[in-house]
């Protein structure tokens, strides 16, 4: 008798396939600030968060609130961070993108005003302010896509810290394993053609080949719905 596929087991929501979110430090959001004012805070620590690739900064604000914010390059313990419409445009400060001069780098950009930050949050990435109009601001994303946003959307001035992460190799499988354990991912991933026939429709056989067409209908049952699902075309483009 066959077994459930990994894609079927994921849907059950067991701990194997769930992210250990109880270990995550905080949900990073820009602090709420009244219009035409600013809020100052001091960086009291730089910490690691298993939920993300970039370091986070613990900031104690003058209103008594302590928050974790995404750390930008150059931030250090003891630095002062400003947030609000009146904040100076310098690395680490949180300002509306409408106040940022063209050509400046920004990160942790809001999609809508006061949503806390949605875009450009991975280590070492940044967006660029391209141009301003009366009711919108153009921002060049890391992908090269130009996004038009409300000028009241806030962002952190500068580049996300931790830019050298992708240049450092893992070297040991154990380190990669423990990193993947912090995410909702099963690791290591076994190729379908390397499995037994009871584990996957593409498994079994004397050599590693699917043994059947890899295209499958959109309406196929869960145990068969693997491979190129409802593919319009297959193979290399000519």
From Swiss-Prot:
- Please give the subunit comment from the record: Part of the 50S ribosomal subunit. Forms a bridge to the 30S subunit in the 70S ribosome.
Against SMART domains, the record matches this protein to: Ribosomal_L2, Ribosomal_L2_C
Q: Where is this region: Disordered?
A: 1-22, 202-223
Q: Which family does it belong to?
A: Belongs to the universal ribosomal protein uL2 family.
Q: Which GO terms describe its cellular component?
A: cytosolic large ribosomal subunit
Comp. bias intervals (Polar residues): 1-11
| GO MF annotation, one | rRNA binding
**Keyword flag Electron transport:** no
UniProt keyword annotation of Ribosomal protein present: yes
What protein does this entry describe?
Answer: Large ribosomal subunit protein uL2
User: Which source organism?
Assistant: Methanosarcina acetivorans (strain ATCC 35395 / DSM 2834 / JCM 12185 / C2A)
Set out the biological process GO terms recorded for this chain's protein: cytoplasmic translation
**HAMAP family on file:** Ribosomal_uL2_A (MF_01320_A)
Q: Which domain of life is it from?
A: Archaea
| SUPFAM superfamilies per record | Nucleic acid-binding proteins, Translation proteins SH3-like domain
Identify the keywords attached in UniProt to this record, alphabetized: Ribonucleoprotein, Ribosomal protein, RNA-binding, rRNA-binding
Please give the function described in this protein's UniProt entry: One of the primary rRNA binding proteins. Required for association of the 30S and 50S subunits to form the 70S ribosome, for tRNA binding and peptide bond formation. It has been suggested to have peptidyltransferase activity; this is somewhat controversial. Makes several contacts with the 16S rRNA in the 70S ribosome.
């Amino acid at each position: 008798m066959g077994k459930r596929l990994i894609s079927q087991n994921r849907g059950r929501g067991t701990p194997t396939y769930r992210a250990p979110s109880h270990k995550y430090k905080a949900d990073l959001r820009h602090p709420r600030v009244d219009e035409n004012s600013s809020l100052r805070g001091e960086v009291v620590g730089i910490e690691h968060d298993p939920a993300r690739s970039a370091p986070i900064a613990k900031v104690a604000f003058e209103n008594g609130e302590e928050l974790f914010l995404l750390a930008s390059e150059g931030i250090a313990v003891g630095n002062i961070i400003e947030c609000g419409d009146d904040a100076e445009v310098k690395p680490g400060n949180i300002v509306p993108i409408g106040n940022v001069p063209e050509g400046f780098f920004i990160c942790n950009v809001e999609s809508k005003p006061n949503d806390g930050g949605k875009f450009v949050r991975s280590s070492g990435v940044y967006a660029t302010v391209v141009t301003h109009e009366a009711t919108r601001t153009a921002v060049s994303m890391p992908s090269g896509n130009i996004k038009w946003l409300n000028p009241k959307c806030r962002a952190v001035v500068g580049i996300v810290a931790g830019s050298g992460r992708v240049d450092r190799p893992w070297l040991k499988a154990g380190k990669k394993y423990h990193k993947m354990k912090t995410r909702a991912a099963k690791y290591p991933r076994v190729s379908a053609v390397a499995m037994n026939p009871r584990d996957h429709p593409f498994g079994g056989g004397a050599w590693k080949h699917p043994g059947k067409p890899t295209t499958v209908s959109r309406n196929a049952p869960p145990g068969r719905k693997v491979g190129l699902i409802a593919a319009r075309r297959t193979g290399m483009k000519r």
